[in-house]
Curated annotation (Swiss-Prot):
Principal place of residence: plastid
InterPro entries: Cyt_c_assembly, Cyt_c_biogenesis_CcsA, Cyt_c_biogenesis_CcsA/CcmC
Domain of life of the native organism: Eukaryota
Organism the protein comes from: Cyanophora paradoxa
Function in brief: Required during biogenesis of c-type cytochromes (cytochrome c6 and cytochrome f) at the step of heme attachment.
Family: Belongs to the CcmF/CycK/Ccl1/NrfE/CcsA family.
Membrane-related topology note: Multi-pass membrane protein
Protein name, as recorded: Cytochrome c biogenesis protein CcsA
Originating gene: ccsA
GO molecular function, one term: heme binding
Length: 322
């Protein structure tokens, strides 16, 4: 069996594992089956190992760390996202909406690599002189790990905002005006919501079904804190990655910063999360306002990583679309 065949097998296997798991995670959300939880975790672990083996295979074959092109770096990002999810799951940080979102995201990413990315962009090729540096591993790997961490943290903020929306909707339906004072809003109420009070406010079947969502609403504060912790971990990595890239650029091209589109968007990404941490730590923001800033970061990362790269402009581009 040659390397190309092995790579294709691992790639195809990983995609179908993620594809099946996406449906099973949604089934788990509906049927609340403990067996499905165990199966889904095992499936994510198997897919993680499969991608790890794919990266190791390319590393051995090429002779350099496999993050030199879009195919390799995106698989490294997928592996990072999967690894962070496994870590959270094993540490009892289990959130159904996060499970569904991550599995769907991983399926789309691997599907893009398997079905859409041109074959020539998957091939192992010799490094250009500028990439023959130890800074390649340092810069790109740290950036990818920071992206994975910040993506999960931002995704948790998006889920948190969805919970806030559900709380507002739920309170309107059960007419829980008596629980709110004139100076309260849904953002402060979400931390102080009384399950028993809401349960006693309505006896109808419709409201009883709605009140089942309170078990998820109770996770909201945990979501907010977990998002903050992940972003706090990912932000220094992003900073280190950008600095490493600047040092590498100076060695390769004689300039620390050239305002390449990738560099510009990396700075924008850094500023978004710097603003989030500043408002959270210095200004004391919590809840909705801080989560909105973090949620914006999720989309900014994708523009920085994929959007700019695929436009075919600048030294970081892969030159596919234009």
């Amino acid at each position: 069996m040659n390397i190309s065949t092995l790579q294709l097998i691992l790639e195809t296997f990983s995609f179908f594992i993620y594809f099946i798991l996406t449906f099973l995670f949604f089934a788990q959300a509906i049927f609340k089956n403990h067996w499905l939880k165990t199966f889904n975790f095992s499936g994510m672990l198997i897919a993680n190992v499969s991608i790890f083996l794919l990266l190791i295979t390319r590393w051995i074959t090429a002779g350099y760390f496999p993050i030199s092109n879009l195919y390799e770096s995106l698989f490294f990002l997928v592996w990072g996202l999967n690894t962070i999810w496994l870590f959270l799951y094993k540490n009892n940080m289990r959130i159904q909406l996060l499970d569904n979102s991550v599995s769907l995201l991983l399926t789309l990413l691997v599907g893009f690599l398997h079905f859409i990315l041109p074959q020539e962009m998957r091939e192992i090729s010799p490094l250009v002189p500028a990439l023959k540096s130890n800074w390649l591993m340092m810069h790109v790997s740290v950036m990818m790990i920071s992206y994975a961490t910040l993506m999960i943290g931002s995704l948790l903020s998006i889920i948190y905002l969805y919970f806030l929306y559900r709380v507002d909707k739920l309170l309107n339906k059960i007419n829980a005006v008596n629980l709110m004072t004139s100076n309260q809003n849904s953002n402060s109420l979400i931390y102080n919501l009384s399950f028993n009070t809401l349960l006693n406010s309505s006896k109808s079947m419709e409201y009883q079904i709605l009140l089942k969502d309170l078990s998820l609403i109770k996770l909201s504060k945990r979501l907010d804190n977990l998002s903050y912790r992940l972003i706090t971990f990912g932000f220094p990595l992003l900073t280190i990655g950008i600095i490493a890239g600047a040092v590498w650029a100076n060695e390769a091209w004689g300039s620390y910063w050239s305002w390449d589109p990738k560099e510009t968007w990396a700075l924008i990404t850094w500023l978004i999360f710097a603003i989030y941490l500043h408002t959270r730590i210095i200004k004391g923001w919590q809840g909705k306002k801080a989560a909105m800033v973090a949620s914006l970061g999720f989309f900014i990362i994708w523009i920085c990583y994929l959007g700019v790269n695929l436009l075919g402009k600048g030294i970081h581009s892969y030159g596919w679309f234009f």
